[in-house]
Amino acid sequence: MFAKLSYYAHSAQDKLGNLLPYEYWQTLQNHSVNVGEMAAEFARVFGAQEVACQTGKLHDLGKYSEAFNHRLHGGSSVDHATAGAKIAVERWGNVIGKLMAFCIAGHHAGLANGNGEGDNRRTLKQRLALKFGEDIPTLDNLWQQEIKLPETLSAPPLKADAHHPFFSYAFFTRMLYSCLVDADYLDTEAFYSNLENKAVERGGYPDLNALQHNFNQFINDFRRRIAQAPEQTEAEKRNAVLNRLRSEILDNAVEQAAQAQGLFTLTVPTGGGKTFTSMAFALEHAKRHGMRRVIYVIPFTSIIEQNAAEFRKVFGELGEQAVLEHHSTFDDGKLQNEATKDKLRLASENWDAPIVVTTAVQFFESLFADRSSRCRKLHNIAGSVIILDEAQMLPLNLLLPIMQAIKELAQNYRCSIVMCTATQPAVQAENGFYRGFENVREIAPKPTALFDKLRRTTVQHIGTQTYADLLAKLGEHPQMLVIVNNRRHARSLYDQAKHLDGTFHLTTLMCAKHRSQKLDEIRGRLKNGEPCRVIATSLIEAGVDVDFPLVMRAEAGLDSVAQAAGRCNREGKRPSENSFVWIFAPEDKWKVPPELATQAAVMRLAADSFSDDLLSTQAVAAYFAELYQLKGSELDNKKILKMHNDTGQSLDFPFQTIADKFRMIESHMQPLIIPFDADAENLINSLRYADHIGGLLRKLQPYTVQIPRKSPRCFV
């Protein structure tokens, strides 16, 4: 009954944990061929199908050994990944073979450093030095009969970047790794699901054409409604003009969608409808060029839910199953269909949904990651339209490697990238940015004229403001927003102003649930014309939908000033000349923090040069050009590109070190769960008894705050 017929990749057990007969096991040949074929299909979009196929075939080669057979029967663990890595280098050499070896050796442990030191992980050089029969098990020659390998292997059609050619090879390795690990996961999942007679809810999404049909229907219905809206009052007339302008912007963008794939900008002022315009362009561009999905990348977790909800709405009955919302705070409890919940939960692992809405942290850290769980999705980024919302928010200290990744996606992976913002960063070569983006196409109609038509505020720098000055203005203006640069300043100012009617305080030391309740109260008071004085940190600039007649902003970068201006006269109901954004210099005690000092200094220069229109496209371009010039090497202060260049000749890329260094948010903070209400208390109590806490922790995200790891114990 238990006669051994072959070597096996996976054993099978009954419900009691007893081994089933071999006929239920997955043979190693079956698994290796399946993974090779699936990896090849994943890599086809970027022309690397043959390399991916052979990588898949070799990934578990070390299982062709008695040692691993013993492991399947309860023995000790065995290194089954190094064997395939060694064979790849022996067969295909130190270029393509070595890139394959990184993937094969790391398909469980993660991509290692090529040489030097590794953090609890052997380097590839150390792995390749291991000897068959001594350090790793001897292979049964049966593998050569079951796994057919070509003598030669053509390199994929990789157009290496002229200035950073080795970056292209490292990027390709991560893409190849993605194809391998996703194929390995999926074939293993399919085997065990079949064994247990379980259906796996993957795939079966609506296609982009169906989504575009629903999207266009929604837009056309909206246009019909606004065409019939009254235009009697001044506010109604302004709203009608605004909606006509939004339609013109959207139509113009869609007309540009036939252009060749590559890099685009959408430079539209706040209120110009860039969210729907960018999606309209992306859907048409994808249709014209046979692209596979749209990935919408947002810098703020706080607004990702609102954007994802808007997309579900415009896609109608297809929205819930088409839109994958992938970020740390996503709670699938708001989805109605249980099958859809399961499918999207699985889709978050590899991003195979047609519409992905995610954070910039998730997107870019994955592109530089070393772990299989983070890299698994990468191959599904290829062939996508990628919308970078609020592109100016990309972190300055990682800007150069991020730009290099964007270039790589456009050049070698059939992607188009739309940089979408009201304050377009001057990262093009034509703006003087050294080795910046080239051939970038603007899809908005005449951005300079748009900014004139959509001007809603008057921005002024009013000099230094003492506490007394700020308190006087808060007392004088019943509805106003004051934004400062740190939580201590916000709290201190609030303590002195809280005697005023309708005074609120918002910082990240309040959990999201608490902030959400306060914002609802704030919006209600603003709508009803009641006193509403808000003192907040920059968190309120992150797409929060509030509309004040007056905003004061402590000195910061011009992009932050523009975000603050988006909270003033947001609905365009007041004339711009009566809607003020006042920039001020705080007292020395609350001066600009060091990390914002350069941005604030350059903003002051722009305020001097463009005092008549500080948020004009010319002012923004001048601001970013000067800022990037001053920052220089700090635009890659983790030396990510240097690490690629220094190790490129030998292809000994330090993948593990790069992944560790590429952090868009430094992890000097720790989450603290706040028992804010009965729901939070119930969830916290459930944690004590839960076997799997991942789902509970996601539900608790709205009740967490981030505090420094070195905070006093009184916090906890």
Feature annotation, model-predicted:
Residues M291-V314, F330, A426:
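Conserved Walker A/P-loop ATP-binding site and its immediately adjacent core
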Residues M1-R225:
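Accessory nucleic-acid engagement/destabilization modules that flank
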Residues A422-G475:
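Interdomain hinge/linker at the junction between the two RecA-like core domains of SF2 helicases
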Residues A360-F364, R374-L409:
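SF2 helicase catalytic motif II
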Residues A260-A282:
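Walker A/P-loop
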Residues A410, A468-H477, I483, R488, ...:
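C-terminal helicase lobe and adjacent C-terminal extensions/tails of nucleic-acid helicase motors
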Residues E317-F368:
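Inter-Walker segment of RecA-like/P-loop motor cores
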Residues H10-K15, T301, L324-E338, N485-R488, ...:
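Conserved helicase motor
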